[in-house]
Amino acid sequence: MFKILKQVGDYAKDAAQAAKYIGQGLSVTFDHMRRRPVTVQYPYEKLIPSERFRGRIHFEFDKCIACEVCVRVCPINLPVVDWEFDKSIKKKTLKHYSIDFGVCIFCGNCVEYCPTNCLSMTEEYELATYDRHELNYDNVALGRLPYKVTQDPMVTPLRELAYLPQGVIDPHDLPQGSQRAGEHPEDILERLQAEKQQETADQ
């Protein structure tokens, strides 16, 4: 009799322990189910880089004085500055400037120490190419302004992983209505069109 009761008690204990383990596993599953999706459907969705994102370097040819400070502060002496001395004005004249982004580590030293602010970091990160030599940007390619993600009506910009409310480090607990801090591209276009029509009507 006592043996049967002991077996029943052990069975109940094992069943309770199994239910506990199942509950722990399901709690993790349900926790992930209530979270918002973190998968980015690239290239139809793109993350908006943060304000201090260090992307492709933008170069302004007219501001450069060929001082070569960027070359001296670069850990790998990467920028190629081609200049000649103009005896008539007794100054250096810049002829060519290039940076190989296949080697660049995007440390930002050149931007920080440039005395004329002719270098700046952009939010452009799509530098993939089939030929590594195409990553060697000359002054013309470096002078091209980047195309912002927020200006592309065919792409949905995802802001929640770049811009979060103060004190929030986990985007999963935000309300469902705050998935995007900004507007959808189609809403932006409609708003701009409405503002343009309003300005036309006021005139």
From Swiss-Prot:
Cellular compartments annotated: Cellular thylakoid membrane
InterPro entries assigned: 4Fe4S_Fe-S-bd, 4Fe4S_Fe_S_CS, NADH_quinone_OxRdtase_chainI, NDHI
Reactions mediated catalytically: a plastoquinone + NADH + (n+1) H(+)(in) = a plastoquinol + NAD(+) + n H(+)(out); a plastoquinone + NADPH + (n+1) H(+)(in) = a plastoquinol + NADP(+) + n H(+)(out)
Gene Ontology CC: one annotated term: plasma membrane-derived thylakoid membrane
Residue intervals of the 4Fe-4S ferredoxin-type domain: 55-84, 95-124
Alphabetized UniProt keyword annotations: 4Fe-4S, Iron, Iron-sulfur, Membrane, Metal-binding, NAD, NADP, Plastoquinone, Quinone, Repeat, Thylakoid, Translocase
Cofactor(s), by name: [4Fe-4S] cluster
Cofactor note: Binds 2 [4Fe-4S] clusters per subunit.
EC number: 7.1.1.-
Annotated [4Fe-4S] cluster 2 binding sites: 74, 104, 107, 110
PROSITE patterns for this protein: 4FE4S_FER_1 (PS00198), 4FE4S_FER_2 (PS51379)
Quaternary structure and partners: NDH-1 is composed of at least 11 different subunits.
HAMAP family in the record: NDH1_NuoI (MF_01351)
Record's function text: NDH-1 shuttles electrons from an unknown electron donor, via FMN and iron-sulfur (Fe-S) centers, to quinones in the respiratory and/or the photosynthetic chain. The immediate electron acceptor for the enzyme in this species is believed to be plastoquinone. Couples the redox reaction to proton translocation, and thus conserves the redox energy in a proton gradient.
Protein name stated in the entry: NAD(P)H-quinone oxidoreductase subunit I
Name of the gene this protein is made from: ndhI
